[in-house]
Swiss-Prot record:
ATP binds at T24, T25, S26, T283, G327, Q331, G428. Coiled coil: none annotated. It comes from Mycobacterium tuberculosis (strain ATCC 25177 / H37Ra). Pathway: Polyol metabolism; glycerol degradation via glycerol kinase pathway; sn-glycerol 3-phosphate from glycerol: step 1/1. Keywords: ATP-binding, Glycerol metabolism, Kinase, Nucleotide-binding, Transferase. GO terms for biological process: glycerol catabolic process; glycerol metabolic process; glycerol-3-phosphate metabolic process. Sn-glycerol 3-phosphate binds at T24, R94, E95, Y146, D261. This is Glycerol kinase. Its EC number is 2.7.1.30. One of its GO terms (molecular function) is ATP binding. Transmembrane segments: none annotated. It comes from the Bacteria. HAMAP family: Glycerol_kin.
Length: 517
């Protein structure tokens, strides 16, 4: 929808919620109405910094500047003033790790992104000496390069002056939600240093039962507690803070919702009951299953995480399968191979062939996440023959997205004992009809996309709105959810089984490729 849509009409009403979505490749601000309908947005990309193989960084200053710009632009384009916004929510790429000076606001180092694998030796050592079991038991996570704890340890050990600053109380840690919130509420002039339970649950540092930083876990990574933010509800009864009047919003708006991006998508998809699941297709894929107030420990390579917490209610938990490379594999076809000029062309190219021609592509660029958790894996194209073309590679790339999701669904069913009946989907790739049809075929269940596909921003808008009474209760959110498109399986059982067997065989070829000992 156009940035300027509705123009002056919007300013006649105060019935709007703003949502900041600070993602891996871009930052956007979106405005929603009472019906959960998007009425405006503005979005800006930021640089992907790749200093060496396996390292991925972002510039924290650029992230904040992009956040300020999208806020200013969407408010200006719609003629909205701060008094027209009932509340503001923040959702973000999780695990990405920032450290900055509380007095100057200057970062000590670039943000280390969730995809970054420089901490593989830290993670491997934790598992080798048995300490990984403590992390699994308390934090619900396996020791992996994915999570914030190892990234923060790396900064403390490798960036001059950071450990001393942390021990003196001068250095602050946060994921992007904390960084954006701190700057919006004043930065060095009294900015609020806080995160929510969902983001904290992705650090390997928070106890899932107490919802607090755990001293035993902190000691594993030698992290001073003083540098950590306060942990709060995803939609607290009192605002985290208010936007600084002299900041990009131009007035005081309460900030009342914070959710990690995948948790926000769960809320946006209204997966609020145990057994409901969604799959978000972005840079990576993230499939979550609501397990209610029960902490379900995975025996099949999944993560146990906080799904959300509203107000002072008990937290709701989830099982999650995190997949590192899905949408970014399509970007690889565009940026590194040059066989497409835009992501949308992947569908047209893949439609030139009826199948993958016996070729499988496993995009383990930075190892494999759920359910394998193998940082020693690297990408591979297998089954290649002279018969294969660019079209087969495009098809195999779309299939890789879907087969990785099948890996997670199978693990989820084994852990929960719940057979998936339908999969709600969201994210950019859901606009690719062929990919979604393949997903239905690979899983053998219907795949359903909602009218509002940007469920991440919508979810945190819901959280922020619930906190201020913009929506009275979660039941109001269900009335807003509407189906846009449904894909029904066309493969028979034999075709489905044969295709998946080939995928599993291909995955085995990617293992033990790099030494992480």
């Amino acid at each position: 929808m156009s940035d300027a849509i509705l123009g002056e009409q919007l300013a006649e009403s105060s019935d709007f919620i703003a949502a900041i979505d600070q993602g891996t490749t871009s930052t956007r601000c979106m405005i929603f109405d009472h019906h959960g309908a998007e009425v405006a947005r503005h979005q800006l990309e930021h640089e992907q910094i790749l200093p060496r193989a396996g390292w991925v960084e972002h510039n924290p200053v650029e992230i904040w500047e992009r956040t300020a710009s999208v806020l200013i632009s969407v408010l200006n384009a719609t003629n909205l003033s701060p008094k027209d916004i009932a509340a503001l929510g923040i959702t973000n790429q999780r695990e990405t790790t920032l450290v900055w000076n509380r007095h100057t606001g200057r970062p000590y180092y670039n943000a280390i992104v969730w995809q970054d694998t420089r901490t593989d030796r830290i993670a491997s050592a934790l598992d080798r000496d048995g300490r990984g079991n403590l992390i699994r038991r308390k934090a619900g996570l396996p020791p992996a390069t994915y999570f914030s704890g190892g990234k923060l340890q790396w900064i403390l050990e490798n960036v001059d002056g950071v450990r001393a600053a942390a021990e003196n109380g001068d250095a602050l840690f946060g994921t992007p939600d904390t960084w954006v919130l701190w700057n919006l509420t004043g930065g060095p002039r009294g900015g609020v240093h806080v995160t929510d339970v969902t983001n904290a649950s992705r650090t390997m540092l928070m106890d899932l039962e107490t919802l607090d930083w755990d001293d035993e876990l902190l000691s594993l990574f030698s992290i001073p507690r003083a540098m950590l933010p306060e942990i709060a509800s995803s939609a607290p009864s009192e605002p985290y803070g208010v936007t600084l009047a002299t900041g990009p919003v131009g007035g005081e708006v309460p900030i009342t919702g914070v959710l990690g991006d995948q948790h926000a998508a769960m809320v946006g998809q209204v997966c609020l009951a145990p057994g409901e699941a969604k799959n978000t297709y972005g840079t990576g894929n993230f499939l979550l299953l609501n397990t209610g107030e029960t902490i379900v420990r995975s025996n099949n390579g999944l993560l146990t995480t906080v799904c959300y917490q509203f107000g002072n209610a008990k937290p709701v938990y989830a099982l999650e399968g995190s997949i590192a490379v899905t949408g970014s594999a399509v970007q690889w076809l565009r940026d590194q191979l040059g066989i497409i000029s835009g992501a949308a062309q992947s569908e047209a190219l893949a439609r030139q062939v009826p199948d993958n021609g016996g070729m499988y592509f496993v995009p383990a660029f930075s190892g494999l996440f759920a359910p394998y958790w193998r940082s020693d894996a690297r990408g591979a194209i297998v089954g290649l023959s002279r018969f294969n073309t660019n079209a087969h590679l495009a098809r195999a790339t779309l299939e890789a997205i879907c087969y990785q999701s099948r890996d997670v669904v199978d693990a989820m069913e084994a852990d929960s004992g719940v057979r998936l009946q339908v999969l709600k989907v969201d994210g950019g790739i859901t606009g690719n009809d062929l990919c979604m049809q393949i997903q239905a075929d690979v899983l053998g269940v219907d795949v359903v996309r909602p009218v509002v596909a940007e469920t991440t921003a919508l979810g945190v808008a819901y959280a922020a709105g619930l906190a201020v009474g913009f929506w009275a209760a979660p039941s109001d959110l269900r009335a807003n959810w509407r189906e846009d498109k449904r894909w029904t399986p066309t493969w028979d059982d034999d075709e489905r089984a044969a295709g998946y067997a080939g995928w599993r065989k291909a995955v085995q070829r990617t293992l033990d490729w790099v030494d992480v000992s």
